[in-house]
């Protein structure tokens, strides 16, 4: 008891000492002007040019200042926006991620349907909120294993050829609870059909199926330089996928502009955004010619942007996309 009392007194004394320490402030220091700061920096550079040493030119040709001041915000209007405002710069809903939390989608790139299924269930158990599966090149091109190039089978992800494969992939995965996230390549018709049949067999409601089973034919064309069929046929299938989703699976996205091919091909952020917007407009106009209005198209559409190591530029890219 005596030891406990002594220990308690020591703790109280330490807490009192912490309370007695005054808060650290910088009131004793005068705030330097920009000119004073620059003068100090020039002295430290020891003859090196200030503009060359302190300003950074990005891959996009944008010059970044060494520090930013309130004067740099003059004339800007988008910095006064909030979530839910008309620009959508900081999100379409005022409550942001509280309204809809960020989706956690750890990609599963196992080679067989059974292995991919185990990986998906493991990731969902760890906290993922989406069943995110990577398909191999053969499946993305629409080839079965018996006709595909051997090098493209199970090269970067799972190979799917039959309804049985899709059944194994989604076995014991609650698609009413978790999102599904699969990029199907140039066409998603075959995969959408298989998933719809699996849901029917498992007595799962397609109305509750949410997430994305998407196609990006122009992206695949940019990646390989060719498609297995005319581009207009893929546009027809894209229109069919939107009409089907609108009627049967209204919470499922079916069209994507995937910028991986441009980002990994060396495009800077400005070029990546330009290609993405051009591609999105092309899809939109193609769907309009097939009787799908703009609002319906964009309801079933999403962007997929690659994110590199330059945090400043990547955040700027995502913000400018929202503005556009």
PLM-predicted stretches and their roles:
Residues 177-324:
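Helix-rich catalytic cores of soluble enzyme domains
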Residues 1-176, 200:
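Acidic/polar, glycine-rich intrinsically disordered N-terminal extensions of enzymes
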């Amino acid at each position: 008891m005596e030891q406990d009392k002594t220990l308690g007194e020591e703790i109280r004394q330490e807490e009192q000492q912490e309370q007695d320490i005054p808060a650290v402030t910088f009131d004793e220091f005068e705030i330097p002007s920009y000119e004073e700061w620059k003068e100090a920096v020039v002295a430290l550079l020891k003859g090196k040019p200030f503009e060359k040493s302190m300003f950074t030119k990005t891959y996009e040709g944008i010059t970044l200042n060494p520090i930013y001041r309130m004067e740099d915000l003059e004339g800007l209007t988008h910095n006064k926006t909030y979530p839910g405002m008309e620009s959508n710069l900081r999100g379409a809903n005022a409550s942001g991620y509280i309204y809809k939390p960020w989706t956690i989608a750890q990609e599963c790139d196992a080679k067989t349907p059974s292995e991919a299924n185990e990986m998906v269930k493991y990731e969902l158990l760890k906290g993922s909120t989406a069943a995110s599966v990577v398909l191999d090149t053969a499946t993305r091109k629409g080839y079965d294993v018996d006709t595909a190039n051997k090098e493209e089978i199970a090269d970067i992800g799972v190979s799917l050829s039959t309804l049985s494969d899709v059944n194994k992939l989604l076995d014991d995965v609650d698609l009413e609870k978790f999102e599904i996230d699969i990029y199907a390549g140039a066409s998603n018709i075959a995969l959408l059909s298989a998933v719809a049949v699996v849901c029917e067999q498992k007595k799962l409601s397609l109305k509750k199926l949410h997430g994305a089973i998407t196609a990006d034919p122009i992206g695949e064309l940019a990646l390989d330089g060719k498609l297995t069929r005319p581009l207009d046929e893929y546009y027809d299938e894209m229109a069919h996928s939107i009409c089907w989703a609108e009627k049967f699976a209204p919470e499922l996205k079916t069209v994507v502009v995937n910028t991986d091919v441009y980002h990994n091909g060396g495009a800077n952020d400005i070029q990546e955004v330009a290609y993405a917007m051009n591609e999105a407009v092309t899809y939109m106009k193609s769907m309009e010619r097939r009787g799908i209005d703009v609002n319906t198209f964009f309801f079933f559409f999403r962007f997929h942007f690659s994110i590199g190591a330059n945090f400043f530029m990547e955040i700027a890219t995502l913000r400018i996309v929202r503005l556009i």
